[in-house]
């Protein structure tokens, strides 16, 4: 605030689609919105993502960790909950300062049970998105899928490096030829970034791909085009694909 900045934009570090959008910034300023959460349409890969609901005139965030076991299927129903939280958050710092003068934000604590190696563990975390409950006039804004492009595995990296995306003024844009991204499942060998780089020196054409599963050591020697549903298996013996290969609805083994 002392530097004259009144709007803060926060996003997950792995979300390559999260850029400062001047249109959203102007919307925040013009309508004096204190807190804004970007939402986007669910796909089968996002059914567990947190969603918004309204109670007593206030927007609230519901994360799957707070959903009873017998209601999880309902929570994951794309027809009932059509959008989910991208964790792209915009906050008006003047409104935040005013709110903090009234006391600390009461953020929802999530309990996640997981294993660290073979040791059961309980991870406690607070969801920044739950802060929207603390602001009168908070907004959930549905945005295009281009603003939610997380890279957590090489599966995601393959998609973003392919011809499914172009870079326009610092923003990744999905090809207009695709409505949904293909399903990618790369095995343990290709989860290693060095193996990934060596095995895919040139990313194949994925425009007409629906599903890709790669097991074991598979290497592309040059350009290639993958179409439909493709399964490449190099578990028993490395599978080497020559430059110019076109693979359509096939299952190949090394």
In which residue ranges do the predicted regions lie?
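A short, conserved beta-strand element in the Rossmann-like catalytic core
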Residues: 16-18
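Active-site nucleotide-sugar/metal-binding loop of Leloir-type enzymes
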Residues: 1-5
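Left-handed beta-helix
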Residues: 21, 26-254
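Short beta-strand-to-loop acidic/aromatic patch adjacent to the donor-nucleotide binding site
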Residues: 6-13
């Amino acid at each position: 605030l002392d530097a004259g900045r009144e709007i803060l934009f926060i996003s997950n570090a792995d979300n390559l689609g999260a850029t400062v959008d001047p249109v959203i910034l102007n919307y925040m300023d013009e309508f004096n919105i204190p807190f804004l959460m970007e939402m986007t349409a669910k796909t089968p890969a996002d059914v567990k993502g947190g969603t918004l609901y309204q109670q007593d005139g206030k927007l609230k965030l519901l994360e799957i960790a707070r959903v009873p076991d017998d209601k999880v299927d309902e929570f994951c129903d794309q027809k009932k909950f059509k959008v989910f939280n991208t964790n792209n958050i915009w906050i008006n710092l003047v409104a935040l300062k005013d709110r903090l003068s009234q006391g600390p934000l009461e953020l929802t604590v999530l309990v996640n049970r997981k294993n660290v190696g073979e040791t059961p563990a309980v991870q406690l975390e607070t969801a920044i998105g739950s802060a929207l409950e603390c602001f009168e006039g908070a907004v959930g804004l549905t945005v295009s899928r281009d603003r939610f492009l997380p890279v957590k595995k090489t599966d995601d990296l393959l998609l973003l490096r392919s011809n499914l995306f172009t870079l326009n003024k610092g923003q990744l844009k999905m090809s207009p030829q695709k409505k949904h991204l293909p399903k990618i499942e790369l095995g343990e060998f290709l989860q290693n970034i060095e193996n990934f780089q060596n095995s895919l020196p040139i990313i194949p054409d994925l425009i007409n791909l629906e599903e890709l599963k790669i097991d074991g050591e598979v290497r592309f020697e040059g350009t290639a085009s993958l179409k439909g549903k493709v399964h490449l298996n190099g578990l028993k013996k490395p599978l080497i694909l020559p430059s110019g290969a076109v693979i359509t609805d096939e299952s190949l083994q090394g």
